[in-house]
Amino acid sequence: MAYQLHYWPTIQGRGEFVRLALEAAGADYVDVARLPARQGGGETALAPRLGDPGNPRAAFAPPFLVDGDIVIGQTAAILLYLGPKLGLAGIGESDGLWTHQLQLTIADAVAEAHDTHHPISTGDYYEDQRDAALQRARAFREARIPKFLNWFEQVLQRNPSGDLHLVGDVLTYADLSLFQLVDGLQYAFPKAAARALANTPAVVKLHANIRRRQRVHDYLQSPRRIAFNEDGIFRRYAELDG
């Protein structure tokens, strides 16, 4: 039975981290909301699962994954579940926990990237909080992007198995998620990302290697890969970069 991924159909967002894992593993999955409405797709397909009174463990918000009777929300939790099944969580419990820790750190970085354009309220337009966004983005560019990427550089450099992967010598969902984080930063903050990446050669190498993996490469070239846009987490506003 195919996995069912439920996420907004027009953005990469947090669902993209799950998509990348499924695609890299060659897993059978359905991106439900991207199906035509006549096939049960569209954004309206998300609401019944989220508001299902018969499910005491319904997800708070997309993304969520359905695998038979199991419904899992939160990107990191979905990947914690999928990782061992897809062979993307390293070898053994210790690798699995380390992979999860890396994913949670990536989630922190993603949340901070989002807050650069919505620093006050997610319910207000960017234009209504632009002054605060300029201040938040400056701190993110100057301090937080380098801090996150430098830490991942250290993880790669200190990996006893070499600097090609974050965990051991095998591909994990943390590698794929770091690829997506770097891709997003390069889109939203091209100048700031370039400065930080100039000091993190192992991160740059991992990003390039992931892009060259056949399944990932094919996915990135396919219509299944939604382009970055200004409705997602990583948004390009020139005034926020520098």
What are these regions (language model features)?
Residues 1-138, 237-241:
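GST-like domain detector, emphasizing the conserved glutathione-binding G-site
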Residues 76-79, 85, 146, 153, ...:
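Generic N-terminal initiation segments characterized by hydrophobic and/or small/turn-forming residues
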Residues 77, 202, 215:
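Residue-level recognition of oxygen-bearing side chains
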Residues 94, 101-212:
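GST-like fold's C-terminal all-alpha helical module
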Residues 217-222:
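C-terminal anion-handling pockets and recognition modules
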Residues 223-242:
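Acidic/histidine-enriched, glycine/proline-rich intrinsically disordered or flexible terminal extensions
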